[in-house]
């Protein structure tokens, strides 16, 4: 009986999706449906785009979102559950003008955007407005394999790890596309294999189990999706991967076993993650170890935060991205909401070697901790050519950060054309903190470029630029067109930056 009910539910879901799609196609709007098991957002019960209804989604993390694709110019209307007295629509630099009327907020979009909305004291809400997918795979096409043909069905309750893993192995051996249709597929750890494309259709969700026993613990810990010793893997689509990290941490009272990464790579090459929503990691969301030639594009990453969920009993280490001992990594056109560092470039795990060429660009960031960071765990070897460019930082405790703590030599890092709206709300409250410190090793930092960066205001505490000693100095720091509080700043004093005696060759221009 349960299986019959589930089949009927899926058919109804598919019918409603098709009906909405036909209506929306006439308006150039593609609504993406809530996945089974997800609940509507009661704080924002309605979103309409060109008068087409878009599903709103509530999450266990006390934030919500709506997701759609569009072409041309569209009008977005968001309905809140109460009269709008104050609102803040970010990123500010996009210059999108919004109007409030009663409990309705309206604005227009002419290109894909990821928007952060705060209304009154309501929980935060996100608008994920994508471009339409180009040639998404369809069941029945050559090389496309439907998950349902492998005895895997949508189920709110069934744990299907082994069946899904066998399907992955089979499709990867054929270098095919595994099509995950709309529905909920609950699973423990899944290992990707070389040659696989994993496609999550709109309305599809791979959801963790919330049970530690479903995640075998290795030397590096546990993970939901594992790219281990593989190459040429694609994870794409407009569906969701949800790690159930909050439930995992509650289930074991925050034990090490519950700190499950959402995606971990180890010795992976030539892999792409594109378009999907990534939700609820147990700790660092994306940990990339000893890997190369990786790309994350148009992702949407949402992890638990202590500001959204103050009743959570443990401090959260929910970093967004941690490229670690890896090279040639591009993270772009995405959205990060997390409690710990949005990105922290590290050199800690794997067989340590020098790392080079990490690019974090065109992203929207909201974090409780550091926004654009190198460190803390950087050991012994060289880290070169790390670039943070064209990012919109909505909220952070620190904006530009280098913690050269454990002996690494960091060379030629760049922060170019980033915009910072709010800095504060946590322990340090600094626009910038760049320093060398002996925490198991004495490092070096050379040739820092901070160009065309804008901070809307001064941070509550002074920024900091501190070398360690007469040998372990920060050498060569260029501030080019640094704007704070509406004015170009031309000296450390003017920019409210504390500089110690172990910094050489600072210039402003």
Over which residues does each language-model region extend?
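Extracellular/periplasmic carbohydrate-active domains that bind, remodel
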Residues: 11, 19-509
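Bacterial N-terminal signal peptides that target proteins for export
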Residues: 1-9
């Amino acid at each position: 009986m349960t299986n019959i009910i589930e089949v009927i539910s899926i058919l109804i879901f598919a019918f409603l999706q098709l009906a909405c799609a036909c209506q929306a196609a006439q308006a150039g709007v593609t609504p993406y449906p809530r996945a089974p098991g997800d609940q509507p957002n009661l704080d924002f019960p309605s979103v309409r785009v060109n008068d087409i209804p878009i599903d709103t989604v509530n999450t266990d993390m006390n934030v919500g979102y709506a997701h759609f694709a569009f072409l041309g110019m569209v009008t977005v209307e968001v309905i809140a559950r109460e009269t709008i007295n104050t609102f803040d629509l970010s990123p500010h630099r996009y210059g999108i003008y919004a109007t409030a009327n009663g409990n309705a907020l309206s604005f227009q979009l002419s290109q894909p955007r990821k928007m952060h909305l705060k209304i009154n004291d309501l929980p935060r809400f996100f608008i994920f407005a994508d471009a339409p997918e180009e040639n998404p795979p369809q069941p029945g096409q050559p090389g496309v394999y439907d998950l349902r043909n492998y005895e895997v069905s949508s189920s709110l309750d069934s744990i299907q790890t082994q069946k899904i893993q066998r399907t992955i192995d089979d499709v990867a051996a054929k270098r095919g596309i595994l099509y995950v249709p709309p529905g909920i597929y609950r699973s423990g750890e899944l290992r990707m294999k070389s040659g696989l494309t994993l496609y999550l259709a709109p309305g599809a969700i791979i959801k963790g189990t919330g049970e530690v026993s479903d995640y075998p613990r290795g030397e590096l810990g546990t993970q939901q999706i594992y790219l281990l010793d593989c190459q040429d893997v694609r994870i794409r689509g407009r569906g969701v991967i949800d790690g159930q990290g909050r439930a995992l941490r509650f289930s074991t009272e925050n034990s090490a076993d519950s700190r499950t990464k959402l995606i971990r790579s180890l010795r992976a090459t030539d892999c792409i993650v594109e378009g999907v929503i990534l939700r609820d990691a147990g700790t660092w969301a994306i940990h990339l170890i000893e890997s190369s030639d990786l790309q994350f594009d148009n992702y949407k990453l949402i992890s638990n935060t202590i500001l959204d969920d103050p009743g959570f009993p443990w401090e959260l280490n929910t970093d967004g991205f941690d490229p670690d001992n890896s090279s040639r990594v591009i993270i772009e056109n995405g959205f990060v909401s997390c409690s710990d560092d949005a990105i922290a470039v590290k050199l800690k795990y794997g067989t340590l070697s020098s790392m080079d060429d990490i690019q974090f660009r065109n992203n929207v960031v909201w974090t409780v901790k550091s926004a654009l960071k190198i460190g803390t765990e950087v050991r012994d070897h060289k880290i070169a050519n790390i670039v943070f460019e064209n990012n919109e930082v909505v909220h952070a405790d620190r904006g530009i950060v280098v913690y050269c703590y454990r002996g690494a030599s960091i060379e030629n890092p760049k922060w170019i054309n980033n915009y910072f709206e709010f800095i504060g709300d946590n322990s340090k409250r600094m626009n910038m903190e760049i320093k060398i410190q002996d925490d198991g090793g004495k490092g070096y930092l050379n040739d820092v470029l901070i160009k065309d960066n804008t901070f809307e205001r001064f941070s509550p505490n002074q920024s900091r630029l501190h070398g360690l000693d007469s040998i372990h100095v920060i050498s060569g720091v260029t501030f080019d067109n640094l704007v704070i509080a509406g004015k170009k700043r031309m000296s450390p004093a003017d920019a409210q930056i504390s500089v110690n005696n172990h910094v050489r060759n600072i210039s402003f221009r």
